[in-house]
């Protein structure tokens, strides 16, 4: 993963200095070098448990549940869940001019630039390499075609899982999100009960309520307002639908329509991924 992060950083730096044409050449060259390095390390560091490396990406609109399902799968498969949203929030919590610039972007519902995301991700991959992590599940990256091309050039993504949910349910979920200011736990106070589309089954998503010790400490993220959420959804569709097409054309995209809440959706997602629920182990019930 150190090779991946170095190549990502090199590609980002090249993109800020040169034209798109020259950047593409440097991306390809860096990708070839990184691919060779990853291949060598892969032969030496095969996963002992089942011999398989997991290098997956989760796509989906803000609030769809990428973090929830990616986290459960990371526990089940014992690979790190790397959420770029968490990387951004950690950076926001660090004092200084960079966090102030980042806060202005996020609070206005804009997507963070490629360069910022790539640098944050690169740092996280380097830290993981130092700890001996094998594989990863990415959540929130890539969000643009350029990011997808950089990632494609430096590592093999096995699978891209595109979670889909009706927009009115997405809006309700985003507005219902809460976080415990003490433990950092994520919860949702929204209770969603909607008629099915085109005669389909009714959609019910119960709230994910906090334990008693967290109830008085719940806070709302500053970017979870109706105006900002709608803007984020619009920006997502403009930028990320081409990313879906990018992976669909390569035969790597699995589109999964969430039928309801976690109890209903989780076993069906495992079935779609050909994973045995009996191997779930530490994943939440």
Curated annotation (Swiss-Prot):
AMP binds at residues 84, 89, 110-112, 140-143, 147, 221, 232. Residues 176-224 are annotated as: LID. GO terms for cellular component: chloroplast; cytoplasm; mitochondrion. One of its GO terms (molecular function) is adenylate kinase activity. Residues 1-33 form a transit peptide. Its EC number is 2.7.4.3. Residues 83-112 are annotated as: NMP. Keywords: ATP-binding, Chloroplast, Kinase, Nucleotide-binding, Plastid, Transferase, Transit peptide. ATP binds at residues 63-68, 177, 186-187. It catalyses: AMP + ATP = 2 ADP. It is found in: Plastid, Chloroplast. It holds the Pfam family ADK. Belongs to the adenylate kinase family. Catalyzes the reversible transfer of the terminal phosphate group between ATP and AMP. Plays an important role in cellular energy homeostasis and in adenine nucleotide metabolism. PANTHER family: NUCLEOTIDE KINASE. This is Probable adenylate kinase 6, chloroplastic.
């Amino acid at each position: 993963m150190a090779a991946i992060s170095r190549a990502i950083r090199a590609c980002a730096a090249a993109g800020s200095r040169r034209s798109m044409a020259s950047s593409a050449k440097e991306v390809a060259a860096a990708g070839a070098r990184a691919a060779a390095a990853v291949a060598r390390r892969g032969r030496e560091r095969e996963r002992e448990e089942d011999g398989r490396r997991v290098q997956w990406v989760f796509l989906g609109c803000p609030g769809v549940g990428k973090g929830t399902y990616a986290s459960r799968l990371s526990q089940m498969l014992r690979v790190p869940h790397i959420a770029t949203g968490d990387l951004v929030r950690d950076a926001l919590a660090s004092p200084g001019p960079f966090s102030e610039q980042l806060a202005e972007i996020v609070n206005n519902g804009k997507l963070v630039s490629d360069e910022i995301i790539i640098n944050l991700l690169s740092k996280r991959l380097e830290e993981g390499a130092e700890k001996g992590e094998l594989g990863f599940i990415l959540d929130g990256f890539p969000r643009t075609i350029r990011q997808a091309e950089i990632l494609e050039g430096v590592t093999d993504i096995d699978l891209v899982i595109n979670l889909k949910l009706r927009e009115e349910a997405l809006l309700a979920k985003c507005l219902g999100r809460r976080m415990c200011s003490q433990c950092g736990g994520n919860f949702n106070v929204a209770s969603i009960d909607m008629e099915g589309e085109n005669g389909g089954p009714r959609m019910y998503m119960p709230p994910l309520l906090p334990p008693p010790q967290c109830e008085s400490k719940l806070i709302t993220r500053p970017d979870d307002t109706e105006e900002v959420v709608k803007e984020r959804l619009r920006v997502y569709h403009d930028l990320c639908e081409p990313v879906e097409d990018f992976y669909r054309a390569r035969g790597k995209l699995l589109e999964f329509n969430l039928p309801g809440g976690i109890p209903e959706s989780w076993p069906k997602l495992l079935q779609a991924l050909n994973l045995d629920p009996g191997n779930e182990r530490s994943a939440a019930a």
